[in-house]
Amino acid sequence: MPFGKKARHVKAYQFGADAPQEGMEAVLEQHRLRTDYYNALVEMELRQREERTALLANLAAESGLESPNQVYERLKAAGEKGIRKHPEYVAARERQKALYGHPRLLELQSRQREERNALRRSFGAKGLYSSNYLDVERAFDKARQSPELRFRRYSPHEGRLAVLYTEGLPMREIGSDTRVQLPLPDPIIYRDRATRRKHQRVLMKFRVRSVERQPLWITVPVYLHRELPDGVCREVSLHWHRVADRLRWTVSVVVEVEGPPVASPTGRGAVAVDLGWRRVEGGLRAGFWVGEDGAGGEIALSEGDLKQFSKVEDLRSIRDQHLNALKEALAAWLEAPPAPLPDWLAEETKTLPQWRSPARFAALFRRWQSERVHADEAAYGLLEGWHKRDRHLWQYEANLREQMILRRREQYRVLAATLARQYDALIVEDFNLRAAAELDQGGSDLPDAARRYRTIASPSTLRDALVNAFAQRGKPVRKLNPAHTTTDCHACGGALVGDPAKELRLYCPTCERFYDQDENAARNLLRRAQEVQAQV
């Protein structure tokens, strides 16, 4: 760290909000432009990747060499395994790197950069606010690190707008800035709950875009339930997402503050956490922790929590049953209506037996409600009754789902804070939870029940809570290779006997005892961390 510089870190604060009091059209316009800009960047990147690949292949051919793609296809046709580590493929990649400084490639890259700048200018001319296109570019640059880029679907029911402070803005000036004006309440209101609840609501002015260099503001009621720290503001963003038939609004404030002081040792050493999900007696296990002081325990959602998550699924099932019954009854009525159908109704419902979305039936109800048909009482009554019941069940389902997700997150945060206070370092497995989730969705051999339990346990939420809790307190987080942590005995190093997918407790022939496989994995992580530390 340079002399005289203080360690700093970034903290994000999220607050509840109400819908903007005006300017919703401008909000949706910016959201649409953001989506279009992101998709245009994706389209451009995919095309530019093809151009770079083709040019590199031509340069390699001119040199009389095979490109990495050609080597890959040749080895694949020959039945080789592990091609990306094959010496010929590795050598081809190294040869390609030598071409990166070729004048023709540098010229192409320069032209492609200018194309991106021109695209930015074109969207700026369309009215996309500068902070929003910078925010989109930040998200895109992160996404383009992945080999697979995906387009985004526009939805008015979910989105965000952002104001970025690249140079930073002192928090004391956030109430009078030209981009965001967020009045900060007197700190005295946070001394007791009653006073805080009475005075936490403030009106934030948020700049959506500029019109002839003048700001176009929207006013958003925000509930500052906790005090914002003194520091440097880096970002203020407005978020919304749909919960059933209404929008839930939040405001996020990102503040750069002085780093936490160096934590004094607790004397209890490190704690290792093995992440996993399995049904156990009394609930759903999401992980197991073991400390160097010998303490340990499972991280689990209770039976009551499981029942509530199951209730969400039950509500969805009930809605599906009601929808199928409605579809069958309406189809029968439409086949033999008591009076000729108007053209719009016949055209609208000609594919009704294939409809699967409740939204299509709801749209049909809204139109039928304003364009009643002669002798339609029976069919319209069915549709009206279904719409009323389904709206209630939809609200029940969506609110319960969000409630349980927030409850789970809070439980994980409380546990993470407790461990971070008690221990000096965190040890977790280094593996890609997102890839595991995508594999589950892509048709893996994982049983449906295990896939469902993974979704409920949400190990990524648990890991994020743990990592954030230790990082906020200035304590290190170490990620270790998880290979064989479950199947190797932590006590003797021998192989455990049993099927980890079916049995919780595995047997060690050497120790002649059974071990909880999750506790065993956590102890192996702890032992490996100690071995690594001893080598330093």
Swiss-Prot record:
Keywords assigned: Antiviral defense, DNA-binding, Magnesium, Metal-binding, Plasmid, RNA-binding, Transcription, Transcription regulation, Zinc
Ligand binding (Mg(2+)): D518
Cofactor note: Binds only 1 Mg(2+) as opposed to 2 usually seen in other Cas12 enzymes; lack of the second Mg(2+) results in loss of target DNA cleavage activity.
Binding locations of Zn(2+): C489, C492, C508, C511
Activity regulation behaviour: Pre-crRNA processing is inhibited by EDTA.
Domain of life from the UniProt record: Bacteria
Region (Linker), start-end ranges: 258-270
Cofactors that this protein relies on: Mg(2+); Zn(2+)
Record flagged with keyword Ubl conjugation: no
InterPro entries, sorted: Cas12f1-like_TNB (IPR010095)
Molecular function terms from GO: DNA binding; metal ion binding; RNA binding
UniProt region (RuvC-I), positions on chain: 271-481
Region (Wedge domain (WED)): 160-257
GO BP terms, alphabetized: defense response to virus
Sequence segments annotated as region (Recognition domain (REC1-C)): 106-159
Region (RuvC-II): 517-536
Region called Target nucleic-acid binding (TNB), residue ranges: 482-516
Stretches the record annotates as Recognition domain (REC1-N): 1-59
Functional summary from the UniProt entry: CRISPR (clustered regularly interspaced short palindromic repeat), is an adaptive immune system that provides protection against mobile genetic elements (viruses, transposable elements and conjugative plasmids). CRISPR clusters contain sequences complementary to antecedent mobile elements and target invading nucleic acids. CRISPR clusters are transcribed and processed into CRISPR RNA (crRNA).
Family in the record: Belongs to the CRISPR-associated DNA-binding protein Cas12m family.
Comment on protein domains: Has a bilobed structure, with a recognition (REC) lobe and nuclease (NUC) lobe. The REC lobe (residues 1-257) is formed by the discontinuous recognition (REC) and wedge (WED) domains, while the NUC lobe (residues 271-536) is formed by the discontinuous RuvC and target nucleic-acid binding (TNB) domains. The crRNA-single-strand target DNA duplex is bound in the central channel between the 2 lobes while the non-target single stranded DNA is bound to pockets in the REC and RuvC domains.
UniProt miscellaneous comment: Part of a type V-M CRISPR-Cas system.
Annotated protein name in UniProt: CRISPR-associated DNA-binding protein Cas12m
UniProt organism field: Allomeiothermus silvanus (strain ATCC 700542 / DSM 9946 / NBRC 106475 / NCIMB 13440 / VI-R2)
